[in-house]
Swiss-Prot record:
Lineage: Eukaryota, Fungi, Dikarya, Ascomycota, Pezizomycotina
GO CC entries: extracellular region
GO molecular function: pectate lyase activity
Source organism of this protein record: Aspergillus clavatus (strain ATCC 1007 / CBS 513.65 / DSM 816 / NCTC 3887 / NRRL 1 / QM 1276 / 107)
Reactions the enzyme catalyzes: Eliminative cleavage of (1->4)-alpha-D-galacturonan to give oligosaccharides with 4-deoxy-alpha-D-galact-4-enuronosyl groups at their non-reducing ends
The keyword Signal is annotated on this UniProt entry: yes
Name of the encoding gene: plyE
Family designation: Belongs to the polysaccharide lyase 3 family.
EC number: 4.2.2.2
Protein name per Swiss-Prot or TrEMBL: Probable pectate lyase E
Compartment(s) where it occurs, according to its Swiss-Prot or TrEMBL record: Secreted
Cofactor binding note from Swiss-Prot or TrEMBL: Binds 1 Ca(2+) ion per subunit.
Required co-factors: Ca(2+)
GO process annotations (BP): cell wall organization; pectin catabolic process
């Protein structure tokens, strides 16, 4: 009897200390896995800011002062930044008050850029059909669909990026009216709580090489039958390692 009385306070303490709300655990996990830097101030842009050469945002938060419209298609005029061919955007936090995050109109470098909350797409890669796009460091979270949308041709290099709560980290455009052969190289990426890390169109010769860690990510690399019919959705062909999707399965957990 005495032993039972002594154990009762310990049982009550343990019972009340256990969280019953599953979202509390998710919130803790998000804070632990998405290391967004502290903002040094905020800037609301009334129109898209175009970047030629190098723009260093000084780790301030930049937005457009508008509400996200979800997956409703936006355009260049809705972007926070548009980076011209050969431009560099670095040390920026993209706030939640925007429809489109960043456009690249050709080869570009996106360095230490963070998306607080992704709206339609975080980063759209456009251009004349070739070039190299570098995403170095930074991260994005809360993307219902795509983080990086690759519409142009060429090569995308994603290095040391962190992504959390997302639909797809990278997607080669599945139904652009003009299609290209595209490649993506992923290294040092940390991915948490997502549906698909990479989506490519293997029928157009797309390739992906992946060296990353992933926790609670359903598919690492998905191959689609891409189309140039903008009104048609591409069909999923397969998922997993292949000649087009190069990685060691399973990826290590983050």
């Amino acid at each position: 009897m005495l032993q039972s009385l002594l154990l009762l306070p310990l049982f009550l303490t343990s019972a009340f200390a256990t969280p019953h709300d599953p979202t509390a655990h998710q919130a803790l996990e998000k804070r632990a896995t998405f290391p967004i830097p502290s903002s040094k101030g905020s800037v609301t842009l009334r129109s898209t800011q175009y970047v030629k050469g190098t723009f260093d945002g000084g780790m301030k938060t930049y937005g457009r002062g508008v509400e996200c419209t979800g997956q409703k298609e936006g355009g260049e005029k809705d972007a926070v930044f548009v980076v011209e061919e050969g431009g560099i955007l670095k040390n920026v936090i993209i706030g939640a008050d925007q429809i489109k995050g960043v456009y690249c109109k050709g080869s570009c470098t996106i360095q230490n850029v963070w998306w607080k909350d992704v709206c339609e797409d975080a980063l759209s890669l456009k251009g004349s059909g070739s070039g190299t796009y570098k995403i170095i460091g930074g991260g994005a979270q809360n993307a219902d669909d795509k983080v990086i949308q690759h519409n142009s041709g060429g090569t995308v290099m994603i290095q040391g990026f962190t992504v959390s709560n997302f639909g797809k980290l990278y997607r080669s455009c599945g139904n652009c009216s003009k299609q290209y052969k595209r490649s993506v190289q992923i290294s040092g990426v940390k991915a948490y709580n997502g549906k698909t890390l990479v989506g490519i169109n293997s029928n157009y010769g797309d390739t992906a090489s992946i060296d990353a860690c992933a926790s609670s990510v359903k598919d690492i690399c998905v191959e689609y039958e891409g189309t140039n019919n903008n009104g048609k959705e591409p069909k999923k062909k397969s998922s997993g390692p292949s000649k087009a999707c190069e990685y060691n399965q399973p990826l290590k957990k983050c």
